Amino acid sequence: MSNGIKVKKRDGSIEPIDLDKMHVMVEAACEGLAGVSASQVEMKSGIQFYDGITTGEIQEILIRAASDLIDLEHPNYQFVAARLLLFSLRKSVYGTKEHPTLEGQILAAVAQKVYDHNIFDKYSLEEIHKVDTYIDHDRDLLFTYAGLRQVVDKYLVQDRSNGQVYETPQFMYIMIALTMFAEYPKETRLSYVKRYYDAISKHKINIPTPIMACLLYTSPSPRDATLSRMPSSA
């Protein structure tokens, strides 16, 4: 459904606003959660549509609306807001709801000069393909809004000058695991990668900021140096 108003998409194209599409997105964010309502989110948003409003602005308004509904009696709105943020993030990073393969993600990020190409020196393509089977993007749904917002704002690889993000949480987690165990024996390291990825992506353990954030230390063993400096770096 459209009321004649035009919206500006992320790629710069202009098209009529699709209120039905927006409703479907909010319904998807509420799916399976008790005590939440898509109509409440839409009413809370109080969106004033105007010609030229961007799809990103619409999504941010909906995210804020859902987060404003979080209270002691309706805690599940924290997951509605998180899902809306996740939908926006995936669309911004990939231009679609579908994720690339791990190899595709690494190649794209290397081309954008935000990942180091030496990951292909450390791991064979066969290993990369094997690790790809470990990734479960549905674990993004475990995030609360506060948790996902912190990850997006602080830890995902991004260009701080313009806010462009280059990865989603599960790729962040698997890249941390791959980097942590790159120097381990090839016979056993993938088992460590999987176990560590499972632990952090299921939020069974929290990663200290020195490992989550980007650091540049001069040391023969960057991983050990990072761990040893945690008290002074945190």
Residue ranges with predicted function:
Residues 1-219, 223:
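Extended catalytic cores of very large enzyme megasubunits
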Residues 221-224, 228-234:
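Positively charged, low-complexity/disordered segments
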